[in-house]
Amino acid sequence: TAMIDKRPKTPREVAAFSLFSMAEEAAWSDGALHHYLSRAGLDSRDAALASRLTYGTVQNQILLDWYLRHFSSVRLKKIAPRVLACLRMGLYQLILMDKIPAHAAVA
């Protein structure tokens, strides 16, 4: 697969790159996440956050898409896959992760 060459530096980058690979290459979440976690060299706490962001976004995609459809004037099919992945991940943090401050979720 043509995974992203850039080395992720943060838990959110690991999660975003994993979600991009899943959306664009039909990669499995486990394989994509493992690939980027191994390249990032995060400590266990940051690796756990990256895993939670990735799996949580995937597991709650139906709910997240419902919110996006409700509040967006643009149809989801018209949104670029990487933009949609970022919107889903940010929304997941805002509505389902109570310990993530809003400014961090959208940064």
Q: What does each model-identified segment do?
A:
Residues 2-107:
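Class I Rossmann-like S-adenosyl-L-methionine
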